[in-house]
């Protein structure tokens, strides 16, 4: 799982710890509507870095919550696996589509294209991206205390 924190304004206090996309105006409602269409299994070729060594780009997003948190917009994303740059491209592309007031059909077209160089795909800055959890479904950990 990942958390992405996006600032609406860049300040000296948040500039190193939050993402900021200048010249982007977006609405929380629009982001949430677009995000609903990414839940489930999809081919995320368009929303990840092009890598010919990765044969399968299908990932299952089980959670994509977007909400106001303090003076930030917070994205909570959980999936069965993540591709390189996938979270940052999801965030950047959702913000870009919201900025241009484009709807879910445009997002579905981006996914269908399977083109990481698609013109509407934007990569959000690395600042603001946080790993929040790792789960291995079939892993049984030995709970024996360390000496």
Predicted regions: what they are:
Residues 1-147:
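Structured-RNA-binding interfaces characteristic of tRNA pseudouridine synthases
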């Amino acid at each position: 799982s990942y958390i992405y924190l996006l600032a609406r304004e860049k300040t000296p206090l948040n500039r190193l710890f939050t993402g900021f996309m200048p010249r982007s105006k977006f609405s929380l409602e629009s982001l949430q509507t677009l995000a609903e269409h990414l839940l489930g299994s999809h081919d995320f070729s368009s929303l990840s870095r092009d890598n010919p060594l990765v044969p399968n780009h299908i990932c299952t997003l089980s959670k994509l919550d977007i909400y106001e948190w303090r003076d930030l917009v917070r994205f909570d994303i959980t999936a069965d696996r993540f591709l390189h740059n996938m979270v940052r491209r999801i965030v950047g592309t959702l913000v870009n589509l919201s900025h241009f007031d484009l709807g879910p059909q445009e997002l579905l077209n981006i996914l269908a294209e399977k083109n990481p160089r698609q013109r509407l795909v934007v990569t959000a800055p690395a600042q603001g991206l946080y790993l929040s959890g790792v789960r291995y479904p079939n892993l049984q950990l030995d709970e024996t205390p360390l000496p």
